[in-house]
């Protein structure tokens, strides 16, 4: 569905966040108008209906619906302007069923510009949260009065985004690289900091956040470019195990969280000493030199696994905070995120990249299960899940003239349209379902167990499983033996064919066709409260986890290998067709150029003298013809009686306009 041209923010925007209402449909803006479009689902397909303009304004940055309280209660729509938020009430008109009326109920003004995602509704009540770069305010009764609850941020950092947990009891605010957690008292209409974890450091700038549970949020962090040049050499690099191997060996630390004093909240960064990389020489192994296509283990040159942006699940418990991290390949600033509770899917995208990645938010693993590719000149300006199968995407397309130059403002002109993409059949969070198993049974039957083990060993020889999560306990100072420092325990997973984080390598080190991350099975960590299975069930579960994802990986890998083989054959053909000329450097006694002198007997003026370079000791007559503007050039073959002492040779050439010779 085409929405037309609009003026939208270039970054940090999710125009479809809280934009769908079950009764009133989809609310959207083109920068000046606020439009409602009917949206209905029939047989698993989205159908767009008529559109109605409810208002025209000087500037509109975004719109979002308040949660549905009761069927007959009026719907509240927050319209975000630059420094103003107006709340409108929509209800059916008494004149007729097809009539409706909209009226403004309240208005919120801020001294600073409101963030692109600066309006966040409470999931259960008509409580509006307004974000600026330096503050957060809560309006408990925004549709009745303008009473404000100021959030005590207690820091000078920049606010990027915020969200409520699904139960509405916790507000999580992302400030720079920290998560600030607050508890909401709905009866007293007050907010206070979390007692056990008021500030949780992530060590990377947080660009987007979305609630995934009653006590869990998903955050997306950007690529920390400023930290790649300030890694600690002692923590990043390990020496070679023997003298024969000169390649770089690094410690497989995939996830690292800055140590935190739970009492004082002071963050101690381990990145202080600069790393000198000038002495490092990379020597490929013999297997890599002989193989046509070589799949290597992840390059741990950056030491801490911070060579890409990350998707992190943070769970707030009463006495524990758990994080799970997975890399986001190819997206530097992931400022778009959406979540579907039924399918446990997380969609991650960026306003500056044409790729949308779908991850499974299952407790045991977070594999990248699908990638949506837009056109090269298209950018996602909003994403949201309509159902567990359908993802609604607002696609913005810039003019070629605007895309060719650096942006001069925070806003740009886009041609916006809506598209719906269906999730893949294998996108269920349960990797052991019967449907997933049957979908790849034919392919798996072709592989014996020995072949699968051999293929797995060839992909990652000697590799150990990477961390799937971090366990941070408040009473860890007594366990670690260090006062004031928290214990960071790596949660190991069983051996698997491919690690989700090791396969998801940065696109700077990989060809584009190998960018999608391959799914990997994983087992629930031991610290979780999962009921213990008996031995036969555990064996069957392990077999299913080994077979289904491995067949999926092999199928994707086979397609990539076929495509790579085609590219290599085309490249070989180009090399054979190319005519290679290895010109020999002329001897010092031979001049690589000649002097051409042209004399016209009909003209009284001076002769023309030009120096012309020779190509392999030859000069084309057509070049001479074009140089002097002749219609015809004829070469006379003569027998030279003698050669001058200076080894110069004279050739007489006759043309229709006179005589010229080369010396």
From Swiss-Prot:
Chain segments annotated as coiled-coil in the UniProt record: 549-577
InterPro entries on file: WDCP
Biased composition (Polar residues): 473-482, 527-539
Disordered: region residues: 454-483, 514-546
Modification sites for Phosphothreonine: 524
UniProt keyword terms in alphabetical order: Acetylation, Coiled coil, Phosphoprotein, Repeat, WD repeat
Post-translational modification: Phosphorylated on Tyr when associated with HCK.
Repeat region (WD), residues: 55-98, 154-194
Interaction with HCK, as annotated region: 533-538
PROSITE patterns noted in UniProt: WD_REPEATS_1
Positions where N-acetylmethionine occurs in the chain: 1
Modified residues (Phosphoserine): 291, 460, 493
Residue ranges with Low complexity bias: 458-472
Matches recorded under PANTHER family: WD REPEAT AND COILED-COIL-CONTAINING PROTEIN
Binding partners and assembly: Oligomer. Interacts with HCK (via SH3 domain).
Entry protein name: WD repeat and coiled-coil-containing protein
Origin species: Mus musculus
Lineage, broadest ranks: Eukaryota, Metazoa, Chordata, Craniata, Vertebrata
């Amino acid at each position: 569905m085409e929405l037309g041209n609009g003026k939208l923010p270039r970054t940090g925007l999710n125009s479809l966040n809280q934009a769908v209402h079950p009764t009133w449909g989809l609310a959207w803006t083109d920068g000046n108008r606020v439009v409602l479009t009917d949206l209905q689902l029939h047989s698993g397909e989205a159908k767009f209906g008529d559109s109605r303009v409810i208002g025209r304004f000087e500037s509109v940055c975004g719109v979002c619906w308040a949660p549905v309280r009761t069927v007959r209660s009026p719907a509240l729509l927050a319209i975000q302007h630059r420094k103003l938020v107006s709340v409108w009430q929509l209800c059916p008109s008494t004149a007729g069923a097809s009539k409706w009326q909209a009226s403004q109920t309240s208005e919120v003004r801020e001294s600073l510009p409101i963030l692109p995602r600066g309006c966040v509704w409470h999931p259960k009540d008509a409580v509006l949260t307004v974000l600026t770069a330096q503050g957060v305010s809560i309006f408990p009764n925004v549709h009745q009065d303008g009473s404000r609850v100021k959030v005590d941020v207690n820091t000078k950092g920049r606010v990027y985004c915020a969200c409520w947990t699904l139960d509405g009891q916790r507000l999580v605010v992302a400030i720079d690289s920290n998560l600030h957690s607050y508890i909401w008292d709905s009866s007293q209409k007050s907010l206070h900091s979390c007692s056990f974890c008021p500030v949780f450091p992530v060590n990377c700038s947080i660009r987007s956040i979305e609630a995934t549970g009653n006590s869990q949020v998903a955050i997306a962090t950007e690529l920390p470019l400023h930290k790649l040049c300030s890694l600690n050499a002692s923590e990043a690099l390990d020496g070679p195990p023997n003298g024969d191997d000169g390649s770089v060996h690094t410690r497989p630390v995939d996830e690292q969280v800055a140590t935190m004093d739970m009492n004082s909240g002071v963050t101690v960064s381990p990145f202080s000493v600069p790393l000198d990389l000038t002495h490092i020489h990379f020597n490929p192994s013999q297997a890599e030199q002989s193989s046509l296509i070589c799949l290597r283990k992840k390059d741990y040159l950056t030491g801490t696994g911070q060579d890409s942006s990350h998707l992190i699940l943070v769970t707030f418990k009463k006495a524990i905070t758990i994080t799970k991290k997975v890399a986001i390949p190819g997206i530097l600033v992931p400022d778009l995120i959406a979540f579907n509770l039924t399918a446990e899917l997380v969609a991650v995208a960026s306003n500056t990249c044409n790729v949308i990645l779908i991850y499974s938010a299952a407790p045991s693993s977070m594999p990248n299960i699908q990638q949506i590719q837009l056109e090269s000149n298209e950018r996602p300006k909003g994403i949201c899940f309509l159902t567990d199968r359908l993802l609604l995407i607002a696609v913005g397309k810039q003019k070629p003239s605007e895309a060719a130059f650096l942006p001069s403002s925070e806003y740009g002109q886009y041609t916006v349209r809506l598209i719906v993409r269906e999730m893949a059949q294998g996108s269920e969070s349960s990797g052991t379902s019967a449907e997933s198993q049957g979908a790849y049974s034919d392919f798996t039957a072709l592989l014996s167990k020995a072949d699968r083990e051999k293929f797995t060993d060839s992909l990652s020889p000697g590799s150990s499983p990477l961390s799937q999560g971090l366990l941070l306990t408040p009473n860890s100072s007594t366990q670690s033996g260090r006062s004031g420092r928290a214990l960071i325990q790596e949660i190991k997973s069983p051996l698997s064919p491919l690690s989700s984080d090791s396969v998801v390598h940065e696109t700077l080190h990989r060809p584009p066709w190998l960018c999608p991350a391959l799914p990997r099975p994983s087992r629930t960590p031991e610290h979780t409260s999962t009921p213990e299975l008996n031995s036969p069930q555990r064996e069957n579960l392990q077999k299913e986890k080994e077979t289904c994802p491995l067949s999926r990986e092999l199928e994707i890998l086979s397609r990539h290998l076929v495509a790579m083989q085609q590219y290599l054959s085309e490249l070989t053909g180009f090399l054979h067709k190319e005519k290679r000329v290895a010109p020999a450097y002329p001897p010092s006694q031979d001049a690589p150029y000649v002097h051409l002198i042209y004399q016209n007997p009909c003209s009284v003026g001076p002769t023309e003298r030009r120096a012309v370079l020779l190509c392999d000791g030859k000069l084309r007559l057509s070049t001479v013809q074009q140089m002097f503007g002749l219609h015809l050039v004829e070469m006379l073959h003569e027998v030279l009686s003698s050669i001058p002492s200076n080894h110069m040779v004279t050739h007489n050439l006759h043309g229709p306009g006179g005589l010229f010779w080369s010396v």
